[in-house]
């Protein structure tokens, strides 16, 4: 059986009226797939997404049918698929990523330093790197194909972008994505903080199910799609240590002649951070 689509990290298989989504151990940074594999990373991504899908279904349904390979075709009942595979509903994916920022970091901080705005949103003067924002802000982006870069856009641009693909629905879908993105973030950020983790920012992907309802697709609140900071050492005014792939990003930035290959010790530290975040958030050891 061959995947019908290979993303930066995931492989997608057609299962008739559903899809099987397999999270590989590949790692991507700056929209580039690195040459390394990070053992168990795919399992962390799948099991963490499952955890959040279960926690947030009262806010918005999601595409997960089952994360148990026993519910999947025989081909997937092999060790390499156990734990990192999810059977999902087929969705018509929306061409916008719902990005939400609760703290000042990354490209949002860089933009603010230039002109005091983030994706066209004017923010108060005097904010510091890693500050908690007065309210979470929604900064959508377009979705790039492999090799291209996602593009941050304004809310108004997201309406126009959605309108191109779904005539007559741009405003409705843009508002729903914004409102759901912020509601999901608030609930999950509060929960994570109670477990000792700050969710600085994250992104969600959405699609339409067979009845035309907007549901959450792809992954949810993983170390690949989010910035997780340890709450016990949080101190605004500078960058924060993290439980996500920021560790790998920082090494790549500091070593520009890297040929997109991480040293083994960086790979090991990266997976340890992924595992630690999973255990802190769920209260369970990864099986």
Predicted regions and their residues:
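Active-site loop/lid in soluble adenylation, ligation, and acyl-transfer enzymes
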Residues: 1-145, 258-287
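Coil-to-beta-strand transition motifs
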Residues: 18, 93-95, 195-199, 211-214
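Intrinsically disordered, low-complexity acidic/polar segments
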Residues: 30, 109-110, 211, 225-227
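Conserved metal-phosphate-binding beta-hairpin within the catalytic cores
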Residues: 100, 199-220
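Anionic ligand-binding catalytic core segments
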Residues: 114-118, 122-172, 216, 220-281
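A long amphipathic alpha-helix within ATP-dependent nucleotide-binding catalytic cores
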Residues: 168-200
């Amino acid at each position: 059986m061959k995947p019908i689509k290979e993303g930066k990290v995931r492989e997608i298989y057609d299962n008739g009226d559903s899809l099987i989504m397999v999270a590989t151990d590949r790692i991507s940074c700056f929209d580039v797939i690195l040459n390394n594999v990070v053992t168990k990373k795919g399992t962390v991504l799948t099991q963490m997404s499952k955890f959040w899908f279960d926690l947030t279904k009262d806010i918005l349904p999601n595409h997960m049918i089952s994360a148990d390979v026993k519910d999947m075709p025989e081909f997937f009942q092999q060790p390499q698929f156990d734990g990192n595979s999810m059977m999902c509903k087929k969705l018509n994916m929306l061409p916008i990523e719902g990005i939400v920022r609760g703290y000042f970091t990354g490209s949002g901080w860089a933009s603010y330093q230039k002109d005091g705005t983030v994706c066209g949103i004017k923010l108060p003067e005097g904010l510091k790197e890693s500050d908690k924002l007065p309210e979470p802000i929604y900064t959508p982006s377009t979705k790039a194909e492999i090799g291209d870069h996602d593009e941050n856009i304004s809310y108004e641009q997201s309406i126009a972008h959605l309108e191109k693909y779904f005539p007559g629905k741009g405003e409705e879908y843009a508002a729903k994505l914004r409102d759901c993105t912020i509601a999901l973030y608030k609930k999950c950020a509060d929960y994570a903080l109670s477990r000792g983790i700050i969710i600085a920012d994250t992104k969600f992907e959405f699609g339409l199910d067979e009845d035309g309802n907007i549901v959450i697709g792809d992954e949810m609140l993983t170390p690949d799609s989010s910035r997780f900071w340890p709450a016990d050492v949080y101190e605004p005014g500078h960058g924060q240590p993290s439980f996500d792939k920021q560790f790998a990003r920082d090494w790549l930035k500091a070593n520009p002649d890297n040929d997109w290959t991480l040293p083994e010790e960086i790979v090991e530290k990266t997976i340890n951070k992924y595992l630690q975040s999973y255990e802190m958030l769920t209260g369970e050891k990864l099986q």
